[in-house]
């Protein structure tokens, strides 16, 4: 303090009045009132910082920091007091009224603090009076008008902390979330378990019903067979009761099996019928001591009806193709498409409604012991010489193009000669076998008969399923002739009943157009356009080859957007450029797919694709129909085609293009169709006789 007073006495210090000191004798508190902003501060360092930060523009400090040495002015206060005073201040960071706070070394009302404050106040007051009297007078006037209140209402005391609830800790929140999620998980598990039980209960009920029905039907069939009548008498000779049992070994040694030609394949068919009557108890059989016999499990008695030897089967024989050399899967597809379009064929022949149903074939030998099933079996065919036909599994699948009629006739003759030669060889071997084989009616002793009856007590084997595999199916030949009959009926119904003079009558059969479309679509692998289920009739390798070909065609078709987009086709404006695009597209298709298609055939294929795609879009998006997997696959190949915008339909006979199918069909029907009635004078065609007669009367003035 002495250094500070020495500076004051020299008179070289420029002082500015910044505030007044306010004292509360009752509470022993001292505060400083800012002269510029009228704020009150309880600590001198805080007041000094306030002056430096808030009123530096008026006071014009020469240094930025520590203008006044707070350590020299208030040596008793430490830095901790400054921090605490700033924290307890209720005003802003640079001003405000602070609460009560104790000094670090002693209380504010101690003698040392009061002495220091009195000396500072006296020095400042004396300096203010001597230097600036006017400021002192104005200050006294303002102080007299607003005397400081002796009470402590103007000072803000430190607030007492209220009762604040302790917030939950992180561990409590985590445990709460865990318990809540666990409760939800348990509720979901209970709900799912109840739903699962209901589903399993419904499935068990659905499965148990057909089982009960099957058991009831089997029980009823067995009861009906038992009540229907006594079992049939066996055709075996009666047992010889007088024969002795000891003759069994000798008879077995003397009996030799019939000798057959080992090179000849044969199948022995036996019909074994078990008797339903219970087996009577009989005495033990006495056997020779020199021969060891093992006990054999005994069942019901068995009667052997007859033993037949079937004719040999030539599996390597090739199938006889039709005159047009069409693979069997093509005939099936044609017949299926023809059945889907009865209105186009105009057939009225009701003699043949449906092809005969294929008999069901067993995959393995099954044991059947019930008599009603035996009664329902068809009669076995006789072992007569019959023209052999190869089974369906041995047919050769061909996907090549249709050959010329000359090659087809040549291959038909070769196959016929090969078939006739194989039939002659089979007949010769069969006659030789019949001469060499022994009769199965050799005489058996009573012991042998008893041994056979006691040991061969097995259930009946269903060998008729093997016999059906050797029999040719009439439905195979029927499917090949079905299309020819339909074509004949269509041509008969489509031909006019009367022939008129000066008329050109020419009606193209619908089946011919259908076959032509199938040939074109088969070349590009798009048979699905005519038959959506054609892949079900083909093996996997054949269907995969069709899909690869269709993928190549669609990839090429996608690059020529001026062909399938009507907007771009319309902007071209010149038919010559469109014709050039079609020609280049045809050349690229022929080069990539290795075929020989003309521009008109390409136009026909594109028209079929556009018509099929528009129909499938209508079925899927507007009629909400479910499409098959194969149709979905082929639709994805042509996903770039417009679905709602108009597409391009090309006339196959001229260079006209149309935005929709209706205009295209109308153009073809009116301009390029072959009508039944054509005028010989002007060449105009008419669909019906009425319009033709009207034309003759009005234009050519003929009665």
Swiss-Prot record:
GO terms for molecular function: zinc ion binding. Residues 148-161 have a biased composition (Basic and acidic residues). Specifically required in males for proper segregation of autosomal bivalents at meiosis I. Expression is required in the male germ line prior to spermatocyte stage S4. May have a role as a bridging molecule maintaining adhesion to hold autosome bivalents together via heterochromatic connections. It is found in: Nucleus; Chromosome. Residues 78-111, 140-161, 205-239, 339-434 are annotated as: Disordered. GO terms for biological process: male meiosis chromosome separation. Residues 84-94, 339-352, 364-373 have a biased composition (Polar residues). SUPFAM superfamilies: beta-beta-alpha zinc fingers. This is Protein teflon. Belongs to the Teflon family. Keywords: Cell cycle, Chromosome, Chromosome partition, Meiosis, Metal-binding, Nucleus, Repeat, Zinc, Zinc-finger. The gene is tef. Drosophilid specific gene duplication generates rgr and tef. Teflon has a function unique to Drosophilids. One of its GO terms (cellular component) is autosome. SMART domains: ZnF_C2H2. A zinc finger (C2H2-type) spans 32-55, 649-672, 677-700. The lineage of its organism: Eukaryota, Metazoa, Ecdysozoa, Arthropoda, Hexapoda.
């Amino acid at each position: 303090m002495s250094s500070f007073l020495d500076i004051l006495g020299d008179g070289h210090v420029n002082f500015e009045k910044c505030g007044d000191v306010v004292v509360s004798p009752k509470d022993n508190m001292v505060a400083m009132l800012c002269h510029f902003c009228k704020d009150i501060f309880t600590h001198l360092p805080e007041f000094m910082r306030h002056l430096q930060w808030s009123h530096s523009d008026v006071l014009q400090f020469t240094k930025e920091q520590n203008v006044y040495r707070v350590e020299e002015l208030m040596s008793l206060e430490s830095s901790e007091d400054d921090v605490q005073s700033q924290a307890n201040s209720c005003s802003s960071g640079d001003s405000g009224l602070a609460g009560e706070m104790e000094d670090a070394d002693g209380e504010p009302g101690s003698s040392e603090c009061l002495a220091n404050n009195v000396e500072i106040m006296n020095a400042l007051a004396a300096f203010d009076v001597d230097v600036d009297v006017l400021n002192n007078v104005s200050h006294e006037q303002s102080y007299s008008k607003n005397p400081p209140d002796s009470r402590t209402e103007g000072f803000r005391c430190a607030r007492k902390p209220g009762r604040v609830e302790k917030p939950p800790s992180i561990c409590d929140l985590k445990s709460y979330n865990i318990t809540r999620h666990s409760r939800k998980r348990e509720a979901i598990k209970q709900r799912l378990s109840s739903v699962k039980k209901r589903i399993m209960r419904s499935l068990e009920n659905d499965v148990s019903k057909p089982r009960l029905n099957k058991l009831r039907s089997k029980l009823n069939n067995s009861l009906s067979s038992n009540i229907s009548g006594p079992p049939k008498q066996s055709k075996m000779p009666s047992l010889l009761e007088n024969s002795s049992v000891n003759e069994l070994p000798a008879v077995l040694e003397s009996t030799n099996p019939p000798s057959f030609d080992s090179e000849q394949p044969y199948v022995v068919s036996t019909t074994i019928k078990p008797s339903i009557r219970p087996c009577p108890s009989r005495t033990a059989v006495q056997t020779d001591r020199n021969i060891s016999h093992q006990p054999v499990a005994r069942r019901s008695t068995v009667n052997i009806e007859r033993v037949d030897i079937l004719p040999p089967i030539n599996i390597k024989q090739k199938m006889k193709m039709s005159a047009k050399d069409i693979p069997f899967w093509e005939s099936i597809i044609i017949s299926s498409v023809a059945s889907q379009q009865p209105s186009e064929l105009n057939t009225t022949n009701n003699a043949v409604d449906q092809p005969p149903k294929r008999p069901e074939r067993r995959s393995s030998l099954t044991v059947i012991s019930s008599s009603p099933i035996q009664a329902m079996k068809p009669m076995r065919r006789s072992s007569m010489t019959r023209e052999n036909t190869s089974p369906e599994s041995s047919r050769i699948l061909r996907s090549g193009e249709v050959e010329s009629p000359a090659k087809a006739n040549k291959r038909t003759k070769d196959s016929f000669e090969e078939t006739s030669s194989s039939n002659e060889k089979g007949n010769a071997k069969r006659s030789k076998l019949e001469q060499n084989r022994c009769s199965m009616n050799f005489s058996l002793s009573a012991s042998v008969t008893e041994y056979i009856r006691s040991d061969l007590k097995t259930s009946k084997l269903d060998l008729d399923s093997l016999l059906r595999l050797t029999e040719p199916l009439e439905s195979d030949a029927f499917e090949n002739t079905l299309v020819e009959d339909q074509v004949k009926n269509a041509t008969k119904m489509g031909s006019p009943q009367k022939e008129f003079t000066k008329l050109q009558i020419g009606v193209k059969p619908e089946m011919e157009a259908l076959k032509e479309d199938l040939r074109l679509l088969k070349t590009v692998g798009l048979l699905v356009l005519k038959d959506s289920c054609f892949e079900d009739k083909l093996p996997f390798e054949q269907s995969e080859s069709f899909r690869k070909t269709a993928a190549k065609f669609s990839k090429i078709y996608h690059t020529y957007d001026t062909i399938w987009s009507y907007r771009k086709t319309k902007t071209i404006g010149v038919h010559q450029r469109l014709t050039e695009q079609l020609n280049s597209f045809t050349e690229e298709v022929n080069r990539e797919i290795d075929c020989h298609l003309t521009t008109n055939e390409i136009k026909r294929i594109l028209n079929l694709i556009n018509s099929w795609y528009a129909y499938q879009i209508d079925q899927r998006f507007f009629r909400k129909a479910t499409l098959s997997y194969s149709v979905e696959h082929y639709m994805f190949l042509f996903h770039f085609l417009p679905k709602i915008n108009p597409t391009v339909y090309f006339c196959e006979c001229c260079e006209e293009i149309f935005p929709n199918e209706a205009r295209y069909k109308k153009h073809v029907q009116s301009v390029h169709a072959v009508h039944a009635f054509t005028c010989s004078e002007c060449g105009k065609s008419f669909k019906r006789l009425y319009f033709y007669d009207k034309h003759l009367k009005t234009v050519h003035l003929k009665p």
